Each structure stands twice: as structure tokens, then as C-alpha cells.
Amino acid sequence: MPVTINNFNYNDPIDNNNIIMMEPPFARGTGRYYKAFKITDRIWIIPERYTFGYKPEDFNKSSGIFNRDVCEYYDPDYLNTNDKKNIFLQTMIKLFNRIKSKPLGEKLLEMIINGIPYLGDRRVPLEEFNTNIASVTVNKLISNPGEVERKKGIFANLIIFGPGPVLNENETIDIGIQNHFASREGFGGIMQMKFCPEYVSVFNNVQENKGASIFNRRGYFSDPALILMHELIHVLHGLYGIKVDDLPIVPNEKKFFMQSTDAIQAEELYTFGGQDPSIITPSTDKSIYDKVLQNFRGIVDRLNKVLVCISDPNININIYKNKFKDKYKFVEDSEGKYSIDVESFDKLYKSLMFGFTETNIAENYKIKTRASYFSDSLPPVKIKNLLDNEIYTIEEGFNISDKDMEKEYRGQNKAINKQAYEEISKEHLAVYKIQMCKSVKAPGICIDVDNEDLFFIADKNSFSDDLSKNERIEYNTQSNYIENDFPINELILDTDLISKIELPSENTESLTDFNVDVPVYEKQPAIKKIFTDENTIFQYLYSQTFPLDIRDISLTSSFDDALLFSNKVYSFFSMDYIKTANKVVEAGLFAGWVKQIVNDFVIEANKSNTMDKIADISLIVPYIGLALNVGNETAKGNFENAFEIAGASILLEFIPELLIPVVGAFLLESYIDNKNKIIKTIDNALTKRNEKWSDMYGLIVAQWLSTVNTQFYTIKEGMYKALNYQAQALEEIIKYRYNIYSEKEKSNINIDFNDINSKLNEGINQAIDNINNFINGCSVSYLMKKMIPLAVEKLLDFDNTLKKNLLNYIDENKLYLIGSAEYEKSKVNKYLKTIMPFDLSIYTNDTILIEMFNKYNSEILNNIILNLRYKDNNLIDLSGYGAKVEVYDGVELNDKNQFKLTSSANSKIRVTQNQNIIFNSVFLDFSVSFWIRIPKYKNDGIQNYIHNEYTIINCMKNNSGWKISIRGNRIIWTLIDINGKTKSVFFEYNIREDISEYINRWFFVTITNNLNNAKIYINGKLESNTDIKDIREVIANGEIIFKLDGDIDRTQFIWMKYFSIFNTELSQSNIEERYKIQSYSEYLKDFWGNPLMYNKEYYMFNAGNKNSYIKLKKDSPVGEILTRSKYNQNSKYINYRDLYIGEKFIIRRKSNSQSINDDIVRKEDYIYLDFFNLNQEWRVYTYKYFKKEEEKLFLAPISDSDEFYNTIQIKEYDEQPTYSCQLLFKKDEESTDEIGLIGIHRFYESGIVFEEYKDYFCISKWYLKEVKRKPYNLKLGCNWQFIPKDEGWTE
């Protein structure tokens, strides 16, 4: 139902309905009432400071602070007048309207409004509702003229206060009673929030947006609407009783350079979303899921038993039962009994936990947010006036398009939108610091380091060791995997999540049971003093700064001198640079000196060395050791040599203690004389084995992200600061030198200080790209070399034990496995002979780390210099070289990385490669690969098709370069040297085959070049080779144009995907590997190579009998096999079989099919196979009791007859790239009995005149045995492909 946001002024009179005097839960019957405003149903705002659990002196800044991991701002005068309270109220109304302005936000509000707490908690008997509970009811004071004041109870879902003592600390507070929380136990309870919209956090953007403008790594201030929505997600979790506040990530504080901070709850990681939930292991994910499911079952049990509301006899039991059924998405049978529908629960759970997240909302609202919950927070800023639409609007927030603020989130950028905020007074700012004091060399020198800047390293006790537990495996053991994703579009469009039942009355009897736990807040000391002789990253950063009151500074290469003397700044750049920077020049030489030193700065900052695969890192930034003293003193002097010896470990301040448990054993349940259950137990053990591998990998990734990658992140932050400090010192030196000249001398100096700043920032941006690549590569290298092998070692031990136990289990039960024991042993041996490969993208969605992992994991990708991929309705370069990609309007894109080029003038893609790539004479050693789909020729245009050539990709400069073109059934690769000499190599496919492997079908093209040869590989196999020894230098353009250019038909088009260029000649094995990787997918494909879809019409194609098709036999419920007609005009070119012939089948999803978020058919899905006949949907069945090896399939209208089976499992045909699949009939999804495979068989028929045999659409037990005997026999008649009608094939 539509959400209505109410409007108020603070001075509006109390009406006892929308404006009331409320006694909040923590007032505990003291008679402290607050003026409260109902901003929308069940949500109240109290424009007062949140004081519960605090002392009055807590509201003043002192030597102590509350949370040790943030900057805290105090102002005891905030909200101390009615005018200030009115501004707060109006601002909150505006923020709620901003939330409501988009469907996603309105749905969030709808679910909060309708997520009313259960009328009771764990103390209430099962058969009762009870409203006299502090987590359900609050009191309001009703006061009318001439009447005695009286209390009345009301139901509320959320009460929002102003802030507590700290203005920039926003928090959602749930209500505990005797140390139990309804918000965590399925019931849900009233939620409270302390919130301040004006003072917002600031974060930076060091890691993101390669190649973006120089402003893009400045500080960004948060959008208060997003801050509020973050808290509202906590509220939503609390109202549904799924708040996860008992699974902390605990910081390790063993060293003085580690953050001292409160534990981070899993609730925060789920609420933030993005990459952060990756820190929660898969087994923990599952335990949380199971706990919520168990709690919801408890609610079901209560609803089925509740008979009365003892605290309020006016409560209509049935109305509330119906409301709670709707809230929890329970189902009700004909007898009125409630139960949980697992699919509905699964959808609700995932929408709450993985759909509503800060990162999803930020993307939907186009708001800039932090990269991670762990991102550093900078001191907050005060937004000047959120009510001013020139500063902040309901539709766009700060990023107002009319003010050109929407690009790159300019409206949130501190450097750009300065009119939106003001810096806060340092007088009221408290920051928790570590004071590091030197006891030698520079005695008495202490530096203050903000706690936020220290290393966050999680303690190993933060992670569950559930993997070490033994597990019983039975025939019905369920999967533990929880897919932690919920597409945002599905969340917006899913009407099932919207309540269709009106809210019950909010009025009830007054609350008299004030049993509630009020949190008590204790202060912490603000500064911790440490004496140390270690020189850490923090001392080195401090040595690169200078006091603001000192202007005459100089650079030094001595770290100790920089600590001792405040006018000296440590520099890690070369001595030549330091000497030039410190050089004093005459006024006439000043401009030239400035130009030189600024250029030198850019050169120094961008120094990097390409290493020959040392420690799996191809790029190293050599000055990191000198800049931050990472590693140790010996590494500092020769960082590259030390790195070569020790690898990425040298960068870590703290080598983490890893939790890598011994994997617990499987206990296999025995079943007497039950073959099906025994086989199902074996299958479940093998499936659970994969889950153990996945869970172990997930545990390792969780520890890596929170113990290793956090250290590398701090190093990146440190290098960003170091480069900025170097730039600030240089700018100060330049300004000081300039200012000592006379006015006359200055007038003759032509210099632009803004230009200096711009060039320095540009140099820093370029350097940060190198640093990010280097540090990210080190982090992934540490994961792959130091962590994953330890996990694999434990997993292989587990596999060996499992294999032994399974083989013994088969031997013990061979009496019941007659005819199957050897096959089951073979299956176990095959399954356990290979390790499960590690894929980082399964465990985190951090695209930067995944990209680095992919580069690490493939020798090929380390040489890739252009890699076009789809993202957000555009093509981007994922090679890391940042090519500029312009996609014109006439190009069609889709999210399968495919793009379509037509003959239209604006159907074009322009790729401008990074100028850092040296691309001259590249033909001496380079490769190009891509997938292509070329449509079928037109029958009446065959001559043009054969003879006309058109270019599809062009990379030419001054008539030299390379191009790819098509002429008929030829793909042609052409090289042209600087003298105009041309060499070509081509691949030609046959168009006279009955069924072509290439026409309109995706195939993989790889072209390689070296000094001697140019080669073309198709689908991984070498097809053509040409000598190019006599060709000279080729100068290729840095610009690549994708466009159909030449003598072409106006309807001509092609499809392409996965275009890549490599700066090496790929080997045969490289190409085969790449073909196999890019061919693989989790879903099945149709005849053309596109995803196989549910609810789409297909003609069925038998790969073993290509010229056959299926037709419903007249007056008979069977499918006869007929021969495809042949098209041939006595042409030497045209010869093909019709594909669009026979019945058009439709794959329908069976209820428990895996793929529930889209219409793609995945491997092992359970399906129905249907088709339309006489405008009625028919289905493919098999008789339950057929006795022969083969039986004709029964084709009939859909029915519930128990004579037939209709459950089909659609399986991948082959491990190798293929578009074929097999259709396996089973009794049902739980059964291990394989009834037979769908295929073609010749049946004997007795005719009137003579006997004959005829082929029919059948189910076959023979195919089952043959597939096991020869699993990859291409000619088997049980291998099927599905042909949809396509614009690229006309008949």
C-alpha cells in the first residue's frame, strides 16, 4: 500500500493521534514523556537528544570517548531550542521523502511499516498473545481540556530520536529483556534509533576509478538519506527478528600498531553488503539461515496454538494471525493450519539480508558510498542547510544534475561542492589516538596516530571452526550452501514482498510491565601512550609532514633528521630530486626550475619496474620500502632484492595466525536392503565433499580479507598520504622560494600555481594506479601461495579419508548394490581424483581483487593488453591498461558480453588504447582472440555473399596495420607493412554441409603472429598457417574500429564477444585452455550457443541423428521421427537441411528447480518438456511400468494421472565445450532411480502388406548403460540440442 509521509512543524499542537506525548521504552514508567510525531504509520520521530544510559557530563567533550574507532563530534547545545528541533523535524521529513522517491526506498519503508512485532516474546506461553511487553507497546499520555490525563498503549515499530552525546554517531538500538532480544529471536520488537542528519561522515576513494579526474580521490561526504537507510535496514532486520548481533569480528590487538576497536558485528557486514559479507564464512552463513528458519518455525508453532490475548481482550486474534502470516510469508492449509513454505522463506530471507544493503541502495539512488565498512573514516563535516534545494534535493541529494554535480558524484566531493558543507570546530572533536614515543635516537619525540589509521587485523577466534565437526550423511541430507545474493531489480519488482493486508489498529491497553534492559555506556581513555624503538609506517609518514607555521622547509633523505628537525621533510625520492628541490635559484631561472622539479616529481612518483615474474608479481613500485619502511631495515636499502627473496610477505607488518581446521569426517548412514538410499547417501557424501572444499576456501578468503588484505589496504592508504605529503612539501618549497623574491622580480615570473597543483595531482593519480596494481597483486599472491595451499593440504587429507570410507561403505553394502557396486566405486574414484579449483569470484564480489586474481591465475591473462567486457550497458577494458571504449548508438549489447554490429552508420565501437602500450612492430609477437556468430546467407543473394568482402575490425595507421574481414564463408586476417606489402591468412568453413557447425553459430577465433608465421585457430584447433617472413615493419594504430565496412547488404550483421589482444604469441595449449574456459558456463546452451531458456519455443535436434525431427503422429499420442527436407537449387554453394521443422517444444521449470532468479536453464535442473497442440499445452510422459529396454514416449495434454512419470533432469552432455544435453527421466527429484534417457529408437511395426521398422521419440534404458560405458560418444541418439528461431537463420 502506498506510503504517506506526514508534514509537521514542531510547534503544532498535540492531537493525541499523529502528534502525541510518548513514554519511550527506556523511560521505564518514570513518567518522562516526549513530544513525538508520526512521520508515517508505526514510525515516530522525537526531536530530542537520546539520553538513555548516559550521564549529563557525557554530552561534553572530555578526555574520554565512547567508541574507539571513530572521530567523535560533541555539541551540548544541539537541539536545545524549539527552532533547532523544528529544523531537525523538517530535515527528517525531507529525508523520508527522498527515501520514498524511488521504488526501492518505498519498498523498504513498506516492509518496515508492515513488519509489526509479534505480540509476545519467548516468555509468553505458546497459546497466548501478550501486548504488555516493552518490545511491543509504548505508552502515550492523552490529555484533553477538562479531562483527567490518562495513559494509553500504542503499537510502534520504530522511534527515531536525535543523536546521543556524539553527533556523528548514528545507531539502531533494540530492546533487551532479561538479556534476551525479540529482534534476534524471530519475534521482532520495537526499534529505536539515534540519528543526526547534519553531521555526516567523510571517506576517501583511493582505490577506485582508474584514469578518472584528479578530483576523484579526494574526500567525499556521505548522503544523510543513505546513512538513514543503512540504519533502517537494521530496523528491518530487528522487526523480523533476524538481527545478527552475536557474531563478532574481533580485532587482534597484539601489537601497538593494530587498531584498538570494538568488535564488528556480522549484522554490520550484512547491512553494508558489497564485498563485506565475504568475511562471513559459508558455514556461518548457513548457521544464521538455519537459526532464522528455526525461529520462524517457532512463530508458526505459536500461531497454530494461540487462542487468546490476555493483556487486551479487544485484540482480534484472527486479524493478527492473518497479519503475521502475511509478514512471515507463511502458508495456510484448508484446515487453517500454518506452515513454512521453504521457497517463500528463502526469498524473504535473501531479500532482507542480501537485497536491502547499503551498497545496493547507493547504486540504485546514484549515491557515492564507502568501498567497504572497513574503509577509513575522516573527521565529519557539517552540512550547511539540508532544507535548501540549491544544496540538497529530494530527487538527487547533493548530486544535482542542473548544477552539473551528478558526474563522478561531484555533489559529494569535498573539493568541488564546498558550498554544501563547513568544516567542524576542532574544539569539539575527539579522536582516539595511539601516542608512539621514541626512547632512543630521538628521545622524547612522540607522534599521535589516529586509531582509524592503524592496521585492522581480525583475530582468528572471529572465525567458526565448524569444519572440524564430524557430520552424519544420510540419503536425505540437504545442501548447506546459501546463495548470498538477491538481484535489486527482483527486489523492486517482486509484489510478493508487499503486504496486501491493512494494518490493525495501533491502539491497545497501556504498558505496565516495564521490565527492560537499558544499555549503560562507559567512556574509554582517549590516548594510549606507547614507547617503542620500532620505525613503523606511521613514524615514516610523520617524518614527511611539517608544521603549518614553518615555511622555510627543505627535503632530506635522512629519516632521523626529519624526526629531529621540524623544518626538514623526509623524502624517499632520489638524491638528484632532493638536491634539485633544495636548490636556490635566481628569479630569472625560477620558472625553469619549477617546470623541471614538477616534471621530476611526476617521473619519480611513477617509477616502476617490470619484474620477470618474481613472486608472481609483474610490476613493482620500488620506492614503497623507503616511503613506509614496510618489511624491515634490510629491505629498505634494496627493496627489489628483498622482495624477490621473500615475496609479498615482506610487506606485512603482522603475519596472521590462521585458523585452518582439520576437516571433520563423514559418518555414513547404513540402510538394509535399500539400494536407492545407499546410492543417494554416496551421492550426498560427494556433494557435501564439494561443500567442505567450498567452506574451507570461504574460511580462508574470510581470514585473508580481514587479516591480510586489510594490511595491504593500509599500505595503499599510507602511500596515498606519502605521495600527497611529498607534493605538499614541494608546493610549500616553491611558494616560499617565490615569496622571497621582490615584487619587481615576481612580476617577471610567469607561473600558474593552480597548474602546478593540477600536474602534481595528476602525477599522484598515475602513481596510485601503479601502487594499487602492485599491492593488490601482492595481496592475491599471498592468498594463493601462503594460504590456499595450506587449505588444500587439509582438504586432500579429508578426501583420502572420505575415499577410503566410501569404498568400504560400498563393499559393506555390495549385497544390496547388485549390478551397481563397481559403477559406484568408479564414480567415487573419478569424483575424488581431482581437486576442486579455487575461484575467488565465488567468495567475494570485489571486482578489483577478482580482476587481479584472474591475472594471477592465468599465464595468458598476464599478457593481455585489451580485454573487452560488458558492464552496466557498456563495454569496458578489463586488461588493467584502461583503454577508452566508445560504443555508438547503433550497437546492441547484452549482459552475456555479446555485441551486435549492423550495416548502420552508427553501429560502431571505437577503442583507443592506452598510450603506455608500445604497439609498433607488435605483429612480431602478438595474438587476437574473439568469439563470432555470422548469419546465414540469403538464398537469393548467394553471389554477393561469396564475392563481396567487408571489414569488421580495423587497426590501421598511414596504410599500415592489421584488419579482420569476412568474405562469404571466409574469415580473413590481413597484415600491411609500412611499404604497403600485404599478407593474409584465412579460415574457410564449408557451407554445403547438411548441418553446418559454423553458420549462425558461435565459434572461437584465435589469430597469432610471430616473426615468421601468422596462424588462425578455430575452436582451439590450428586451421591455417601462412609464412610472413618477407613482411617488414607494421605500425599499428592505437585506435581500433569495430564496424562493418565495405560492399555489404543493408541487412547484414554479426555478433561478437570476448574480444582480447595479447602482447605475446599464444601457444596451442594456451588457446585450448582459453577456449575451454570461455566455453564453460553454469548454464546450458541452445543450438546457436546462447543460453537455453525456460518458456521459449525450440525445435529439438538430435546430435546423433542430425537429419531427423520429431512430429506428433496423427491420431496417436507418440512422436514419430521424420527426415528433414533438403534445400538445394542445383547450386554449387547452397545445400542445407531445414532446421525449423517438427514440433516446437517448451522447457518448463519444475518447482524445485535450481534457477529461481532468472529464466536460464542450468545443468541438473528438473524440468517438464511441453509443446502446444491444437492451442493446448501438452507434455512428454513415460509410462511408469514399462518393461522393455525402449518404450515410445507418451505425448498428451497436461494431467495429474498417476500412470506416468513427467520429471526430467536436464544434464550436461560432455565435459568438453558442447551445446548438447541429455534428458533423464526420474521418478521424482528425490529418487536415485534413473528410469531412462530420452532418445530415438527403431520400433518394429507390422504392416498390412509387409513388415517395417520405424523410428520414434522414446525413452531408453539401453542409452543409460551405453552412456556409462562410452560417456562421450558423439553419435549417441540421446544427445539433444534445442533450436530457437533466430534472425541469423532464415529458411
From Swiss-Prot:
Region (N-terminus of receptor binding domain (N-RBD)), start-end ranges: 858-1079
Binding site for a ganglioside GT1b (d18:1(4E)): N1025, E1189, E1190
Effect of K1192 to M/Y: Decreased binding of heavy chain to host SYT1 and SYT2 independent of gangliosides
GO terms for MF: lipid binding; metalloendopeptidase activity; protein transmembrane transporter activity; toxin activity; zinc ion binding
Major enzyme class: hydrolase
SUPFAM superfamilies recorded: Clostridium neurotoxins, 'coiled-coil' domain, Concanavalin A-like lectins/glucanases, Metalloproteases ('zincins'), catalytic domain, STI-like
Keyword hit for Repressor: no
Mutagenesis or variant effect for W1262L: Greatly decreased toxicity, heavy chain has decreased binding to synaptosomes, heavy chain has dramatic decrease in GT1b binding. Gangliosides no longer increase heavy chain affinity for SYT1 or SYT2; whole toxin significantly less toxic
Disulfide bond residue pairs: C437-C446
Keyword annotations from UniProtKB, A to Z: Disulfide bond, Host cell membrane, Host cytoplasm, Host cytoplasmic vesicle, Host membrane, Host synapse, Hydrolase, Lipid-binding, Membrane, Metal-binding, Metalloprotease, Neurotoxin, Pharmaceutical, Protease, Secreted, Toxin, Transmembrane, Virulence, Zinc
Effect of Y1263S: Greatly decreased toxicity, heavy chain has decreased binding to synaptosomes and dramatic decrease in GT1b binding
Pfam families: Peptidase_M27, Toxin_R_bind_C, Toxin_R_bind_N, Toxin_trans
Motif annotated as Host ganglioside-binding motif, chain positions: 1260-1263
Effect of F1204A: Greatly decreased binding of heavy chain to host SYT2, whole toxin about 30-fold less toxic
Sections of the chain in a coiled coil: none
GO biological process, one term: proteolysis
InterPro entries to which the protein is assigned, alphabetical: Bot/tetX_LC (IPR000395), Clostridium_toxin_transloc (IPR036248), ConA-like_dom_sf (IPR013320), Kunitz_inhibitor_STI-like_sf (IPR011065), Toxin_rcpt-bd_C (IPR013104), Toxin_rcpt-bd_N (IPR012928), Toxin_trans (IPR012500)
Active site: E231
Domain of life (superkingdom): Bacteria
Catalytic activity field: Limited hydrolysis of proteins of the neuroexocytosis apparatus, synaptobrevins, SNAP25 or syntaxin. No detected action on small molecule substrates
Cellular-component GO terms for this entry: extracellular region; host cell cytoplasmic vesicle; host cell cytosol; host cell plasma membrane; host cell presynaptic membrane; membrane
Residues involved in D-galactose binding: I1240, H1241
Chain intervals for the UniProt region annotation (Translocation domain (TD)): 442-857
Family recorded in the similarity comment: Belongs to the peptidase M27 family.
Protein name: Botulinum neurotoxin type B
Organism: Clostridium botulinum
